[in-house]
């Protein structure tokens, strides 16, 4: 769609450097109505000045929607039922937020009769893919405006200069020059000193977690209850999904839990360094797997575990609304019907470790079967035939190799 044909744009607006300038740029370049949408996913004080800032920068209308409960209930929890983790370290805090933002942005576009949507993701990153796959899922004909792929402001310094020229306040200082993205699941950091892959992230970068060295010298034990694979209570106190994750963030943060420094493979093909704080999510995943250990059938667990990397890639690459992710989710949710119980974890100086698990209704652990002291329900001699059958292919292979050497 040509610029002159665009009548109304809904912009995913964070109030940060990129989207603040994009808002002004859209007004100047398209000369049409621009509506900003900001999702409250647990950013805290970051949202306080957004409404005034958006109007001051040229917004015609401003949406700020509290999506915290929906975020955790319908996006984070389903992902954690799958134990999803990308490349062994990343708990997908940014990745899982983008589908919800895209969903609500498209709902607003429909309500407002907008013919275009816009975002602040760069042309080198993952978020452009995540946003736009979501947009096209809800409206295949929507016009997407991605300024980073169109304008000539192709460096952070150029953006800062543009902002100064247009009197746009920006939250970037020499003391905190890196970019960040925060929600209830995590906070991520990129750029600046982190572009040197050998340099350690400075301690003043971290927001959610204490330094493990300065964390309490006494460990804290936390009990988390699960029903159908979802956390429902902490230390016996029932909480909503968003309340529960926020509570675990605070507890985990006090003990320095959930720091990750990762050089990850982006969906567009390049490598990128990110530093993440995911205190509550780290605790939640550890506890969830502990309850699974006592309630989930072995073959079901192994099959599900084999699919974790694929599921995580779908989330990371922006395919949350894809049929393949929905198919996997159905299978995973079926496996979670028996994941009912309580896990006890120990938090101490950056470490989260399971120290106990139990299930009153769905435990598959039977002491009579597992003990090494009794043979009432398990005849140890039966193991001989089991071993011989399972070793058959190995024995045949050895015999054939020996025959070749003769």
Curated annotation (Swiss-Prot):
UniProt keyword annotations, A-Z: Amino-acid biosynthesis, Arginine biosynthesis, ATP-binding, Cytoplasm, Ligase, Nucleotide-binding
GO molecular function: argininosuccinate synthase activity; ATP binding
Origin superkingdom: Bacteria
Residue positions binding ATP: 12-20, 39, 120
InterPro entries associated with the record: Arginosuc_syn_C (IPR048268), Arginosuc_syn_N (IPR048267), Arginosuc_synth (IPR001518), Arginosuc_synth_CS (IPR018223), Arginosuc_synth_type_1_subfam (IPR023434), AS_cat/multimer_dom_body (IPR024074), Rossmann-like_a/b/a_fold (IPR014729)
Pfam families, alphabetized: Arginosuc_syn_C, Arginosuc_synth
Assigned EC number: 6.3.4.5
GO biological-process terms attached to the record: argininosuccinate metabolic process; L-arginine biosynthetic process; urea cycle
Subcellular location: Cytoplasm
Metabolic or biological pathway, per its Swiss-Prot or TrEMBL entry: Amino-acid biosynthesis; L-arginine biosynthesis; L-arginine from L-ornithine and carbamoyl phosphate: step 2/3
Family matches, as PROSITE patterns: ARGININOSUCCIN_SYN_1, ARGININOSUCCIN_SYN_2
Protein name according to UniProt: Argininosuccinate synthase
Native source organism of the sequence: Geotalea uraniireducens (strain Rf4)
Gene, per the UniProt record: argG
């Amino acid at each position: 769609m040509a610029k002159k044909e665009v009548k109304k744009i809904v912009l995913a607006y964070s109030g940060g450097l990129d989207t603040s300038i994009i808002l002004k740029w859209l007004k100047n370049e398209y000369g049409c109505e621009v509506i900003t949408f900001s999702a409250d996913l647990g950013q805290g004080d970051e949202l306080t000045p957004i409404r005034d800032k958006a109007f001051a920068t040229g917004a015609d209308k401003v949406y700020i929607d509290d999506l915290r409960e929906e975020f955790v209930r319908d996006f984070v929890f389903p992902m954690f039922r799958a134990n999803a983790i990308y490349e062994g370290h990343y708990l997908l805090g940014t990745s899982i937020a983008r589908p919800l933002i895209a969903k609500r942005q498209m709902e607003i576009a429909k309500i407002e009769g907008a013919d275009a949507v816009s975002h602040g993701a760069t042309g080198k990153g993952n978020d452009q893919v995540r946003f736009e796959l979501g947009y096209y899922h809800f409206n295949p004909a929507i016009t997407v405006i991605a300024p980073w792929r169109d304008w000539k402001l192709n460096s952070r310094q150029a953006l800062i200069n543009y902002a100064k020229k247009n009197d746009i306040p920006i939250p970037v200082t020499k003391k905190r020059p890196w970019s960040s993205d925060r929600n209830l699941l995590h906070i991520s950091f990129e750029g600046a000193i982190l572009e040197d892959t050998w340099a350690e992230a400075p301690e003043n970068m971290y927001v959610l977690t204490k330094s493990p060295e300065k964390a309490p010298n006494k460990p804290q034990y936390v009990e988390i209850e699960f029903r159908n694979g979802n956390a429902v209570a902490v230390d016996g106190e029932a909480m909503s999904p968003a309340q529960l994750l926020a509570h675990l963030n605070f507890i985990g943060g006090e003990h320095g839990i959930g720091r990750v420094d990762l050089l990850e493979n982006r969906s567009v093909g390049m490598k990128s360094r990110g530093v993440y704080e995911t205190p509550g999510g780290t605790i939640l995943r550890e506890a969830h797997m502990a309850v699974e250990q006592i309630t989930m059938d072995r073959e079901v667990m192994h099959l599900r575990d084999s699919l974790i990397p694929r599921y995580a890639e779908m989330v990371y690459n922006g395919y949350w609304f894809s049929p393949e992710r929905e198919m996997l989710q159905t299978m995973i949710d079926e496996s979670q019907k028996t994941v009912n119980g309580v896990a006890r974890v120990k938090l101490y100086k950056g470490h989260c470790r399971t120290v106990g698990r139990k299930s009153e209704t769905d435990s598959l652990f039977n002491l009579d079967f597992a003990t090494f002291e009794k043979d009432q329900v398990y005849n140890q001699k039966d193991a001989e035939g089991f071993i011989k059958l399972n070793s058959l292919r190995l024995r045949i292979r050895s015999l054939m190799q020996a025959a070749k050497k003769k």
